[in-house]
Amino acid sequence: MDERRMTNEQRERERRRKAAAARKAAARYEDPGVGYQRRRRARKRRRRVRNVCIALLVIFIVVIGLAGGTIYWIKYGPTKETYDLNKYFGITAKSQMGVTINNEVLDAQAITEGGTAYLSYNLVQDYISNRFYWDSNEHILLYTLPRDMVKAAADSKDYSVSDTVNSEDYTIVKTEGDTAYIALDFLQKYANFDYEVYKDPARVVITSKFGERQTAKVKDDSQVRILGGVKSPVLEEVKKGDKLTVLEDVSDWKKVCTKSGVVGYIQKSKLKDAKKETISREFEEPDYTGIKKDYKINLVWHQVTSEAANEGIEDALAATKGLNTISPTWFSVTDNSGNISSIASTDYVDYAHQCGLEVWALVDNFDQNVDDMELLSHTSSRENLENQLVNAALQNGIDGINVDFEQIPTDVGDHYIQFIRELSVLCRVNNLVLSVDNYVPKGYNTHYHREEQGVMADYVIIMGYDEHFAGSYEAGSVASYNYVKEGIEETLRDVPADKVINAVPFYTRLWNETPKTDEERAEDQGTEAESYSMKVTSEALGMEEAAQRVSEAGATVTWDDTVKQNYAEWQGDNDSTYRIWLEDASSLEVKLGLMKDNNLAGTAAWKLGFETSDIWDLIQKYVN
């Protein structure tokens, strides 16, 4: 090809071809040693290139691994973030303390002053002992011992046990606004609990429930977190060998409580030596021993409305048999200061004693001018009432006091039971029997504190009647079998059988039903009575009069096996119907059978004079 016609590219290819041919020709005449050296140097160059590439690849892999590990750690690794313990315990003020009670973190209702820890009265009531009573009106703390009252005034180092004054080196009760705080050291004199105080932040750890608990030890240094998960903030660092209380299993985590009162979560794999332990504390509970008769109580209430009526005691008792206790209605609270009216009679008591009867005088709160809250929430008023009752009992030779406080409002319940506690001390010291009347237990009367009554009082009496009463919207039995049975069974959940007396009615109600008029239905709209189609009225009748009214009406009596009573009905004027569930020997025998089956302390009855003569033989059969 003519070189003048060749392109640059063609010329470059031709040059390379000639150079390669020249190298090949030269190689035929080259020294063999020189060729070897050249090849060796070429191999070294290739190895260096390969090693550099491998090193670069390794570095790349390491960098990628580190980056991936960092990303994985950020996403899945345990955080070292800590949670603010002041926030955790709810501490917002310098004097506040966090509170953990029985492995539960509570609101920070505790304070510290001068090295003394104080717990709020509300927490004392709920977690330590509800036997401590704070009078917010007169600023007095009270605790009831079997034969003494412990008293401590607010912001004082002094306290009294009955008439003996003692002192502590700390203020016993501190007040901040409406809140009372009680020194834990003082509480521990009378209540069974342990406590420890910790710092940073200040907190108190209390144990008031003793018994079996699950524990485990920490394998290696670890963390307790606010939630189950490695990303949850740390509440507390725990050391190898630390003992934790195990509260709950949560997947791969356990909910635990540390010694310092922190409740949180730790991985199961961090724990070992799980076992059950029993915790206890040496403490002698006060023994509120009272009076227990060595016979079954056979009591009847005697409604006495005037001093003159006391003279009828001989006639009233003439037909009775087997009776051993009588309760005359002698005392009534007359004002909010705790004063009482009394129609007690020494002659009455003397005659009852001659008949072999004890006298347990009744006190009621039926005066509409008396405000139960005002009366019972002031210590001075309660004490005045208690002293007047006991003094009247001693002056008249009375054997016991029967408390019949009815329709106590819910918010007065704590003050009412404190009254019973305080009265029990005076009765115990003066050898007086204390009995307390109660409704059949229902959800709406739990504030009567039957369980505490069962500790403080000698006898707890169930008023096993008024199932249907004067204001009821429908006719029904005064004391059906199931109603009485429920009353006994529910009371026995709270009170020992040897303190329980079941009261039966010597009366019934005669009901009159008439269809409501349009006007009456209109009046009842929006009220509880709206759902009832009949207007009902009733009158209370004693056993004899009730039987007489049925006889006069010519009605047929049939046994109602559901309520276990004889039943009768008849037509009256103006489309009205009369209904009556009779109380008689047949119905009372069933109720007395319940008393016997449950081995109760005895029976009571309302009221003397309403019974027929055959009833006493029946009762005698069950109480003897």
State the predicted function of each range.
Residues 336-340, 387, 410-546:
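Substrate-binding surface in catalytic domains of secreted glycosidases
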Residues 281, 508-591, 623:
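Glycan-binding loop/region signatures in secreted carbohydrate-active enzymes
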Residues 326, 403, 460, 502, ...:
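Conserved, mostly hydrophobic/aromatic
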Residues 278-383, 388:
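Glycan-recognition patch characteristic of GH18 chitinases/ENGases
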Residues 143, 241, 253-258, 266:
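SH3/SH3-like beta-barrel fold
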Residues 3-4, 8-9, 15-16, 29-250, ...:
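Primary recognition of N-terminal secretory signal peptides and signal-anchoring hydrophobic helices
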Residues 305-320, 378-394, 442-450, 583-596:
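Short, acidic/polar
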Residues 587-624:
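Acidic/aromatic/glycine-rich contiguous surface patches that form carbohydrate-binding/processing clefts
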